[in-house]
Amino acid sequence: MSDVRGLLDRISAFRQRLESTPRIIPEAIPIDSADVPPTVRVAEAFRQSLRQITGMVEVSEGPLPVLTDRARQLLSTAQTLLARQNKFASEPAILGLSNRNDAANDSLIAYHRETVAVLDCGVRLAQAFPESPSAQLKLCDGLQGMLAVVADRLAVQERTLAQRQSDYSRIDRIAIVYSAMHQNQAVGLNSIAALAEELLEDARQTKPLRFLHTEPRSTHSYPGGTETLAPARYLAAHAINTAQVIARIVSFDYEWASRPLVPVVAALMMECGMMRVPADVLAKPSPLSADERRLIEQHPQHGAHLLTRYATDAALLAAAVATHHERGDGTGFPAGIKGAQIPSLGRMLAAADTYAALCSPRPYRPAQDTRTALTDVLLLAEHGQLDKDFAEYLVHLSFYPVGSIVELTDGRIGTIAANHVNRMDPRSPGRPIVALLAEADGTLISRPEHVDLSLATRGAVLRTLPAERCKEVLGRRYPELA
């Protein structure tokens, strides 16, 4: 039962055998209806089937079998699982994502539909309960196995949906503030400070560093979700990524360790001035024109102006936002100031902003491997563009932060479970503790295997797995990772 794919194959074969079995309820599950989402259709059919089998409603096709206690207990369990599945299928985010043209490419929706397929088989198995108690008990073994799989899959679905809803909510909260400021509306920073506290708490709990991304033209998280002006959500995702990085390094800086909220809030607000750059410009895969580049280079100063004008007590934040693209050697923008002229908070933002940007995809390039991104930031610091202290704080994230999906030198795939304490040990970056998820040929491992690569005889981290490859290999089993 641990190998869900194998189980689904057996279910498919079993379903074919059941097609010829006389049914208690004819056509309990309609084939298709353009007006009713398939997940809701199956759920309603399954509920009706269970009610009829357990005698809650009358049926017209002869007497029902007398069910054993075990059969009734399993049907009661099935009803409980069905209620959870129906609730999941009715969530606005799931309904919205299911109605998108590319719904089949969404790992969570694909996973959900496979769960529905297992439930469908459960309906057919329940319909086939015979009169004989001994025969019922044999079928109960199969139904119990299916329900165990459904319970496990529902837990994964619910956990993945909760994470997505949290991501959607965080992006929307920032995007709403950015949109309001762009429309010359006064805003309070209480909601931003609350989000900053959440990110700091995530860092304290050593939760995985997850880089969020939306398209520049995106106006909502899913059809029917909260709508904001473009490119507010795209900018909000990058601001959150930068804030997550700062939340994890601020404790190492003597100046800001005692007041970590300010740097995280500054990171969350640093892109507000970019709202007047058209989404089409940010979505360009080709080089920018001189006018487009000039407009982008004005966004730090414009953001500082918006903060000063529309937010209260924001002078410190405004100074940091105005300088987060300045460089230590004077090659930055908008003012071209250098060295100590740049406030410390601006220099911290610059290092975290650069790292977060490199780790995220852009219309003109894919996301960089986290090791490459960190190396590039350290090189920029070595050449005097970024502050060395703040750049070196990023080493505490390791070349491969906890939660990264990685490919090993022998082709196996896993996720970083922990990094070694001595991050300066040259052997440590490529040899963390990894939870192995797939073999080199893409075969999924039934249960994650934790391996300390520093003690293993083979394998070291080769690279961060690209997003598309991650979805291809892991999406069907681990939608939360894809």
Where are the model-predicted features located?
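Non-catalytic interface/linker regions that flank or bridge core catalytic/transmembrane domains
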Residues: 1-235, 440, 447-482
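Histidine- and acidic-residue-rich, metal-dependent catalytic cores
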Residues: 161-482
